[in-house]
Regions:
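Active-site-proximal loop/turn and secondary-structure-junction residues that shape catalytic pockets
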Residues: 170, 239, 264
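Small/aliphatic-rich secondary-structure junction motif
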Residues: 1-33, 58-65, 134-202, 227, ...
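Gly/Ser-rich helix-loop-strand patches that form or flank binding pockets
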Residues: 66, 72-129, 244-289
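Short alpha-helix boundary/capping motifs
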Residues: 47, 71, 101-102, 143, ...
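Structural alpha-beta junctions
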Residues: 116, 161-162, 230, 287
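Hydrophobic residues within alpha-helices
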Residues: 53, 111, 149-152, 156, ...
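Structural beta-alpha unit
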Residues: 4-16, 20-89, 204-258
């Protein structure tokens, strides 16, 4: 909770108070009253939230450690997560300030982007009549993070008796877009230096075919990893823009959970990107956890 923020905002609005409240002694008295009520009130509200969670944990035999912090939400959460050794942090994708147009709340976005930890972002809250979702879908691109996601996916599929599906997407179309965008601007001399026609043919005959083989090999390795842990798995290789194809897949048949690495195979060794573009797009747009 953010009692300090309320205190700051109250002081900003003091000049709007009626005249009888603008005397120095009266303003100071009102500040103390406001600070006491807000701090106490927010502590009570936070405690009530934890009481509800505590009851649910007790009913399921789960131990609960209660923690409350005063400060800017995402800042305090990041400090706490980085200071602890949590196996998993679970957050709702939006908070109480959501609107119909909200894709992701500011707290969720900032915490997930700035903490290099495992997160489960809850986006789907099942209703009583909903058909249960039964698939753990893992996206593989060959990066260490994606295979880390696979290990988590295998564990979840076994523990919760879910189907495991792995998906990989390669993009053979990007070079066509790039080549078409430069063909009209290259001078004859530049085209010769660049060996435009040879480069185009190289991509068509070698690189695009090679990409398909590379990503298929990632799927094959992932399949063996699952089978070694006695988990049945289905695998899918698609071509196109990664986030778009994965989004189409989860929109057509939403899984129980989609698991992704924070970053992908194109991350540079010393690059601190926060989240990769595919992960960030799907975090916003996928209709599933």
């Amino acid at each position: 909770y953010a009692a300090a923020m309320h205190d700051y905002r109250f002081k900003e609005m003091e000049y709007t108070l009626p005249g009888e409240y603008l005397q120095e002694q009266e303003i100071e008295r009102q500040r103390k009253i406001h600070d006491s009520l807000i701090t106490m009130g927010l502590e009570l509200i936070s405690d009530c939230y934890l009481n509800v969670l505590g009851t649910q944990c007790s009913e399921r035999g789960i131990e609960l450690q209660r923690r409350m912090m005063d400060g800017k939400h995402h800042i305090e959460l990041i400090k706490d997560i980085e200071a602890q050794s949590y196996d998993l942090t679970v957050m709702g994708v939006v908070g109480v300030g959501k609107t119909r147009a909200s894709q992701i709340g500011s707290v969720c976005e900032r915490v997930v982007r700035n903490c290099a930890r495992d997160f489960w972002v809850v986006k789907h809250v099942p209703k009583e009549r909903d058909v249960p979702r039964d698939t753990v879908l893992v996206a593989i691109d060959g990066s260490p993070q994606s295979f880390g996601a696979l290990v988590r996916g295998i564990e979840l599929a076994k523990r919760f008796d879910k189907r495991l599906e792995i998906i990989s997407v390669y993009d053979p179309y990007l070079h066509y877009t790039v080549f078409n965008s430069i063909v009209d601007v290259l001078t004859e001399k530049a085209a010769k230096v660049f060996r435009f026609e040879e480069q185009n043919q190289l991509h068509e005959e070698v690189i695009d075919t090679g990409l398909a083989q590379i990503y298929q090999s990632h799927l094959n390795i992932a399949e063996r990893m699952a089978e070694e842990r006695e988990v049945e798995v289905s695998k899918t290789l698609l071509d196109g823009k990664a986030f778009h194809k994965i989004l189409q897949r989860v929109e057509d048949d939403p899984p129980w959970v989609l698991i992704l690495g924070r970053v992908g195979v194109h991350k540079l060794k010393d690059e601190d990107t926060g989240l990769g573009s595919t992960t960030e797009n799907l975090l916003r747009m996928a209709p599933c956890d």
